[in-house]
Regions:
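The AdoMet/dcAdoMet-binding core of the Class I SAM-like
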Residues: 5-8, 19, 23, 43-159, ...
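SAM/dcSAM-binding transferase cores
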Residues: 2-20, 24, 32-39, 46-47, ...
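A short, flexible beta-alpha/helix-coil linker loop
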Residues: 30-34, 139-142, 167
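C-terminal substrate-binding/active-site "lid" region of AdoMet-derived donor-dependent transferases
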Residues: 145, 151-215
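Short histidine-centered beta-strand/loop micro-motifs
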Residues: 34-37, 125-126, 197
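A generic structural signal for alpha->beta connector loops
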Residues: 85-87, 110-112, 164, 190-192, ...
Length: 261
């Protein structure tokens, strides 16, 4: 199949590219925002999306999932198919991106699945109700929008989660402010936070939970993984290993700091 580059009618910053049976969405070429395998549209092709599904290790049966940033809808489609009892709401600022939902085989709205056009930060500030999982994957042609990475935004994310709720944030690893954003999330969630590198190294996925004990220990994670792997073949074992590895590093760092003091 020949390559196809198709800018949307209203903006030159949103670009579709089709090649080798894959359809990709770009906000700032050549950076890929989303990628879909046309013969298997619900498959999570990009590794950062598979890492983000690690929220299942912390919240295996979410009743309500809210996602900020739709993109090509990879996570939205996967959650709708594999978590049919969960309500899923995606909030996307760009109507041009939403207009591409048919190209990316994003299902129509229904009782448990909705795509809303609006500002994600404003949506959470309003009467949005509480969620069990918040997925933050909002980017534009400039990168991370300021409204989706401020201290006030992360504080509001904490407030909008049920007890035990999980925040998952996709960050660009090469963003000079990445460490600052992680610090803001740690502050909002009282240090109940761990950062896992996506396999390609281009993304850092932050998991934070509104709970007293975090993260789960080895035995608990192993048991959850055993139950989840029969349904979710999305490298949850790698994400679990990343969580445990980063938590060990954090604890060692604390011990070293105390010893120096």
């Amino acid at each position: 199949m020949p390559d196809r580059d198709t800018p949307t009618a209203d903006t030159e910053s949103t670009l579709l590219h089709e090649a080798n049976g894959e359809l990709s969405l770009h906000f700032n070429f050549p950076t890929i925002q989303s990628r879909m395998l046309k013969v298997d549209p619900d498959r999570l092709v990009l590794d950062y999306t598979r890492t983000m599904m690690g929220f299942l290790l912390l919240q295996p049966k979410p009743k309500r999932i809210v996602m900020i940033g739709l993109g090509g809808g990879s996570l939205a489609k996967y959650c709708r198919r594999t978590l049919p009892n969960s309500e899923f709401i995606a909030v996307e600022l760009s109507d041009e991106v939403i207009a591409l939902r048919d190209e990316f085989r994003i299902p129509p709205d229904g009782p448990r699945f909705r795509v809303l056009c609006g500002d994600g930060a404003e949506y959470l500030r309003g009467d949005a109700g509480l969620a069990d999982v918040l997925l933050i994957d909002g980017f534009d042609s400039e990168g991370q929008p300021p409204g989706l990475c401020s201290p006030a935004f992360y504080d509001n994310c904490y407030a909008k989660l049920n007890a035990g709720g999980v925040l998952v944030v996709n960050l660009c690893a090469n963003d000079s402010a990445c460490g600052c954003y992680v610090g803001r999330i740690r502050s909002a969630f009282d240090e109940k936070c761990v950062v896992v590198d996506a396999e390609d190294g281009d993304n850092k996925i932050v998991f934070a939970q509104k709970c007293n004990t975090f993260p789960p220990g080895f035995n608990e994670l192993t048991e959850r993984l055993r139950k989840l792997e029969t349904i979710h073949r999305v490298d949850l074992d790698k994400t679990a290993q990343g969580m445990l590895r980063q938590e060990r590093k954090r604890r060692w760092g604390r011990k070293a700091t105390k010893q120096k003091a």
